[in-house]
C-alpha cells in the first residue's frame, strides 16, 4: 500500500468496513473469497487490514505477483446478463497486455504505487483477443496498460503485426483506446497502429514545454509528442486526454512562455480542429513525491480537496485527510496559462493551411491563413533547407544526423539553415539540437 497508515485510517473512519485489501489484490481477494474470515487464514492474506475484536490489525504477509500470461477476464456472466436483459450497450472488452509502469520516475505521479511492472506475451494477448471474439462475437477492445509499448519497440512491433492479423481476419475489429509513451515511437510503428485500427490514443502529455517535461522527469519530450501527434492525426488516430498539469512545483514563467511559443509549431494541428489541450490541476497526497516539500515549507494550506471538505474534522483530523484523499489541488494558478489558452484558441479558430508545389528542381512553399497567402518560400531540391525538411519529416533527427546525411555541406551552413527554418515555423528544434523535426509533411507535393 502506498501509505502504511491508509488502510487503518479507512477502517477507523468508515466503521461499516470490515477489511481493506491493498496492493494488486488478485491473490488477496481470491483467498478472502475462498476462506472468508476463517480463523488462522487472515494472517496469511497479503496486504489485508481487518477488524479483530476491538482492534484493527494489519498483515504484512509478502504478496506474490501473478503471471499475466495466466490471467484473463472471465466475461461470461457479463455477456449473459446483457443478452438476458437485452441491454442496448456498446460493448468493449478490456485487455491487459502489461501492468505497472516501466518508467516510474515521473515526479508528479503516484498512480502505480504497489504495482510491479511486467508484460504479457504477445501470443497470450492475441489468443485472448481471438477467444473473446469467437466466444462473445465482440470485436471492440481497449487496452488497460499505462503504456502499451512497455519500453520495448521490438515487442510492440510484433504485437502490432498480430493485431493487424486479427484485423485482417475480422474486418470490424477495433482498438477503441490505448495509452502509449511517445519517446522512440517511429513513423513505421504509428502507421502499423493505424493498420491495426487504433481509434484513439492517450500519450501522457502533461506539458507543452520541453523544459518542464525534463524537470519532472517525463520519458516523453515535446519533440516526441509533436512527432506522434503529427502522424497519428494524419493516419486517422484520434488523441484523447492531452492534459496539461498546472501548478507543477517545477513550473515557472519561462516554462509556460516556452509552451506558449511552442503553440506556433502546432498551428496546423490546432487549426485542424482534431486536437486541443485539456488544462487541469496537479493533485497531491501523502503518496506524492511533492508532499514532503509542501509540508516542510508549510505550503499545504494552499491546497484543498473537494472530497475531504465534505467530512468534518470531528470525523477525521486534517493531517489524516492528506493520507485518505488524493485530490488535493491548488486552485490559484499562474495567469500566463490564460495567455496560453487565448493563443491556443486563436490557432483553433483560424484556419492555417500549407501546400508544396514542385516545378523542375524548385519547391515552392505557400502558407495560408483563412485562405489568404501569408508566406511563400522557395527551396532548391538539393539544398540544405529542403534536405533538412525531408530528412526530419518521418523521423526525429539531431544536427549531427543531418551533417552526416547531407552531402557536400558543413556544420555552419546546416546551423544557418536550421535557424532559418525554425524562424519560419517549419521545423521544431530543441535547445540542444538533438531533436529536430519537420512540422509539415514534405510528401504532400503538387507537381
Stretch-by-stretch model annotation:
Residues 323-397:
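Hydrophobic, secondary-structure "cap" segments at the distal end of domains
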Residues 10-11, 132, 193, 232, ...:
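Generic structural signal for hydrophobic
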Residues 69, 73-236, 246-249:
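Radical SAM [4Fe-4S] cluster-binding motif and immediate context
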Residues 4, 119, 395-396:
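Residue at a beta-strand N-cap/secondary-structure junction
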Residues 1-63, 422:
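Glycine-rich beta-alpha loop elements in corrinoid/cobalamin-binding modules
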